[in-house]
């Protein structure tokens, strides 16, 4: 099980260093067009491959541009991670857009809309946070 802990530790370090590099290291203007958040990092068991999930605030066009910038910077990022983490061979880095936050916001919006509709029909008393007993 020590192998699993090592992979988790490396993933946490990659997340930390990548966050730092997104702020100070990557100079590509496309990357700085939207607010980029790292949501998750997955590292393969042999530490040779790394998938970084990012959430990007902005419209679809700016998200695509930021993703292009991140993919273009993946070689630089691989070199910096190898140097900073002092790994013999740095993992190949792939960025993937994480739409989980968008989906969550959409679901919350739908739930709020449903609650408003139920209040209008009188199914839920206005100002009540509790669901009616069935």
From Swiss-Prot:
InterPro entries for the chain: KH_dom-like_a/b, RbfA, RbfA_dom_sf, Ribosome-bd_factorA_CS
GO molecular function annotations of the record: ribosomal small subunit binding
Gene Ontology CC: cytosol
Xref: Pfam families: RBFA (PF02033)
Keywords: Cytoplasm, Ribosome biogenesis
Gene Ontology BP, a term: maturation of SSU-rRNA
Protein's cellular compartments: Cytoplasm
Database matches in SUPFAM superfamilies: Ribosome-binding factor A, RbfA
The family this protein is said to belong to: Belongs to the RbfA family.
General function of this protein: One of several proteins that assist in the late maturation steps of the functional core of the 30S ribosomal subunit. Associates with free 30S ribosomal subunits (but not with 30S subunits that are part of 70S ribosomes or polysomes). Required for efficient processing of 16S rRNA. May interact with the 5'-terminal helix region of 16S rRNA.
Subunit (UniProt): Monomer. Binds 30S ribosomal subunits, but not 50S ribosomal subunits or 70S ribosomes.
UniProt protein name: Ribosome-binding factor A
